Amino acid sequence: MILVLVMQNKFKRKDFLKLALLTNLALMAKPLEVFSEKFADLNFPSSNDNVRYFKKGDADYNLLRKGFNKRIDKFPLIIALCKNTAGVTEAVKYAKQNGLPVAIKSGGHCMEGFSCNDGGMVINLSLLNKIEWIDANNIKVGPGCTLSNIYDEIIPQGKMLPGGSCAGVGIGGLTLGGGYGLLARKFGLTCDSLQEITMVDGKGNTINSANDKELLWACRGGGNGNFGVITEMKFKLFKAPAWLQSYRFKSYKVDTKKAKTVLQKWFQVTANLPTGCFSAFVLNRKTIYILLTNVDKHNAAVQKVVDTLSALTEKTTKTKPQPITTALKVFYGRSEPLYFKNASAGLYKNFADIEACIDKTIDTVIATPGMIYQVNTLGGNIENVEAEKVSAFPHRVFTYFSELQTYWDFPKQEAPLLQKFEQVQMLFIGNGIKTQYRNYPDINFKNWSDMYYGANFLRLQQIKNKYDPENIIRHEQSIKAR
């Protein structure tokens, strides 16, 4: 059976209201500043059934330009809200003809706002949100589908696509940068399930990866805003786990010595974590929070982890196994945009990788309100050798991924928090942590090409040369043609 979920054929006002709800962008519009005179040199494109264009001053412009991170405030010259591949083609050709850089937005969750720009064109893919069943084990989706859209469609059919836990994230950006989550250790990265893509390249040509396996390789972990605009993605699916059980372990009022001891022991106990399990260590000021989830049968190996972490911390909370749909929604997270910075703080093989700098890191986190240091388990089927051969994601040898986060309520709090944030990042980099996850970018990474892509960068650059030699598709850390 082929089931297609589509938006209405014609653009209507209510479509944009729905879009606001789906992408969590229903924000108060700020007063408009005087915009660039650049339009004096352009013929503003006409909207049609394939694409609708917006400029500053239009009713939906502010709604469409904003993303999940309120820290990012950019003003594109034109927003192209595309309905299909033809609309994307038209928008890219217009941008190319008029020398406008193109940023691509599916869910708007890029940590550094690379899905928007100042003075260029943003191609908004929110309406490319079809889900089509090819057969019982494969689907085609538009890049504008959010994770919750996909989960709500496939889990009732007993199927799973390993993705993240944040409901509003777009499948396009998640996949193109790798894509990990609670089920990655069991099923692999999101990009490992990617079978085929359709893309409009920087020349305005429509390309299908069935005719270019090198392009598919690149889009499995190396494709974020680099080569073109993805308009369709084909994924293989797995049998969905029936249940998910979670455990939460907490310690309070910890000092640096205690936090370091718990973290070191957590590394040891998770080194041989069962494949169906995921764990995260979280330090939020003086509180330690450890999450453990399991989608396989509870056995002695899982119980050993539970017992060790319980003995190490002060409070253990155990949930009964829940249906996978219900359990995942617990982790969907906040839907409203907020002020924050969240970036990769390195990929590790073990505690020894950070031992030299972890004391100062913990000192800073404990002393800084709003700052969080988190380490997540990788490994399991992410380390799949066959997947490594056919994907650009370069970090499978690492079994842990860390992230640094900081949050605030008012703009005046931003500068001192970002200063502390950068201090911690420099601690890691100064102690040899130089491998980073592209889906959690940091605008301050200097050698980002090596950090994100490693030895694969030159190969990715060759693909950029082929599909976008004029560098039309670009952002602050996109791969540039040579």
Residue ranges and their predicted role:
Residues 2-482:
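Soluble FAD-dependent oxygen oxidases
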